[in-house]
C-alpha cells in the first residue's frame, strides 16, 4: 500500500438494499412497510385467525410517507414483507432558488442542491416566511427507497 490518502465522496446507500425483510406478524403500528413499491408508515394492523386452509393473515393499513396516500395490504403472518430503510437527516437552509429548489448545508460543509421546496402548504409557508425573515432554519429531510423529501422545520434563532 502506498502512503497516498484516498478520498471519496460517500453516498448514502453505497449500493446497499433499499429494503430489508421482516416477518409480517412482527410488524407493528408505527413501523414501516413497503406496499405497492411505496415506503409507508403503518397506522393499523389487524390479524385474522388461521382458517381451515392456510395461515393467519395480517391486514395492514398504512400511509405513504411521501405522498400521504392510504394503502392497504393483506399478507400471511408467517411471510416476509419488505421494510424500507427510512432515515431522517437535519440540514441547515442556506438559500431558496427561483425555480423552487433549496440549498442546504450538510454536516461536512458541502451543499445539497437537489431538493425541491416541500409540497405541504403549511410547511412551505413556514420555510418561505422564516427564510424571508432571515431566521436560521434547520430542515429535516426524510429519505427512503431512493426518494427524499423535506418533512420538518426547526428555527434555531436569528442569523
From Swiss-Prot:
It comes from the Eukaryota. Residues 1-23 are annotated as: Disordered. One of its GO terms (biological process) is positive regulation of translational termination. Lys-52 undergoes hypusination, a unique post-translational modification that consists in the addition of a butylamino group from spermidine to lysine side chain, leading to the formation of the unusual amino acid hypusine. eIF-5As are the only known proteins to undergo this modification, which is essential for their function. Signal peptide: none annotated. CDD domains: S1_eIF5A. The keyword Lipid biosynthesis does not apply. Residues 1-12 have a biased composition (Basic and acidic residues). The modification Hypusine is found at residue 52. GO terms for molecular function: ribosome binding; RNA binding; translation elongation factor activity; translation initiation factor activity. The keyword Protein biosynthesis applies. SUPFAM superfamilies: Nucleic acid-binding proteins (SSF50249), Translation proteins SH3-like domain (SSF50104). Keywords: Hypusine, Initiation factor, Protein biosynthesis. Translation factor that promotes translation elongation and termination, particularly upon ribosome stalling at specific amino acid sequence contexts. Binds between the exit (E) and peptidyl (P) site of the ribosome and promotes rescue of stalled ribosome: specifically required for efficient translation of polyproline-containing peptides as well as other motifs that stall the ribosome. Acts as a ribosome quality control (RQC) cofactor by joining the RQC complex to facilitate peptidyl transfer during CAT tailing step. Belongs to the eIF-5A family. This is Eukaryotic translation initiation factor 5A-1. It comes from Solanum lycopersicum (Tomato).
Amino acid at each position: 500500500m502506498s502512503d497516498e490518502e484516498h478520498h471519496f465522496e460517500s453516498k448514502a446507500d453505497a449500493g446497499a438494499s433499499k429494503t430489508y425483510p421482516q416477518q409480517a406478524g412482527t410488524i407493528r403500528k408505527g413501523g414501516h412497510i413497503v406496499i405497492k413499491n411505496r415506503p409507508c408508515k403503518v397506522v393499523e394492523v389487524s390479524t385474522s385467525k388461521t382458517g381451515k386452509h392456510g395461515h393467519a393473515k395480517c391486514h395492514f393499513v398504512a400511509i405513504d410517507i411521501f405522498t400521504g396516500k392510504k394503502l392497504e395490504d393483506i399478507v400471511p403472518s408467517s411471510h416476509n414483507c419488505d421494510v424500507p430503510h427510512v432515515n431522517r437527516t437535519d440540514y441547515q437552509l442556506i438559500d431558496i432558488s427561483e425555480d423552487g429548489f433549496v440549498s442546504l448545508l450538510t454536516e461536512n460543509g458541502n451543499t445539497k442542491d437537489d431538493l425541491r421546496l416541500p409540497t405541504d402548504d403549511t410547511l412551505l409557508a413556514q420555510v418561505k416566511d422564516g427564510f424571508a425573515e432571515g431566521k436560521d432554519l434547520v430542515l429535516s429531510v426524510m429519505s427512503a427507497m431512493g426518494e427524499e423529501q423535506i418533512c420538518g422545520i426547526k428555527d434555531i434563532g436569528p442569523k
